[in-house]
Curated annotation (Swiss-Prot):
Identification of the protein by name: Photosystem I reaction center subunit IV
The protein's role, per its UniProt record: Stabilizes the interaction between PsaC and the PSI core, assists the docking of the ferredoxin to PSI and interacts with ferredoxin-NADP oxidoreductase.
Species this protein is from: Prochlorococcus marinus (strain MIT 9313)
Gene (UniProt): psaE
Compartmental location: Cellular thylakoid membrane
Matching NCBIfam families: PRK02749.1
Domain of life according to the entry: Bacteria
Amino acid sequence: MAISKGDKVRIRREESYWHNEVGTVASVDTTGKYGVLVRFEKTNYFGMQGTDNGNLTNSFAESELDRA
């Protein structure tokens, strides 16, 4: 599929907080299993209570992504 930096991708990993969400590929590292770093607009639930802080990125395998 050859995903590259800057591509818009949809997340297929069902257990992911961002399942079926669209994000932007921030980097691709071919040496590891989860080598595609994807950046999202919304944060996940790991922020401290009462703040909007949280993770904006997560790593995925290329097989867990579809081009959007």
